[in-house]
Amino acid sequence: MKKIFFIIVQLVAICPVLAQSNTRLIVTTDIGGSDPDDIQSLVHLMVMLNDVDLEGIISQHAWVPYGTGADSIINGVIDAYEDVLPNLIVHDKRYPDANVIREMVKTGQPQAAMACVGEGKDSEGSEWIIKAVDKNDARPLWIAAWSGMNTLAQALWKVSHSSFGSKVI
């Protein structure tokens, strides 16, 4: 009887762990500067997409010169992902289609620091963060900062100055 009880306790303890779903993730990046770290990180993320639910890739200014090339670099990495996707799917069917990822590429704040935070300074990226948070999904949304956080700051500023501001933690 003790053995059966022990087995049942173990099953009850492990089932929630096995049932956990992927982590929701948005990445902010200053990709395209002189440091290749974000390109390397993005390639690594692409091969891990079976284990996370990517909800956005937001290019933004940090401290490097910002231009229109960031989205093209991101899309180049997604193109490379698309090339190897058939091989990745052989190992795990949960890899998302490249077009789904392309739709998540957004542009964030065009200037560094707090210069782009405040009234009328919303960006495609800050709006995307708000939209992702507002999804009907009980899982937490993780935001990985590979660059500055001013796009997230703008999203938080906007929500904190809206009718829902008192609910922002």
Language-model segments: residues:
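N-terminal acidic, glycine/proline-rich low-complexity segments
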Residues: 20-169
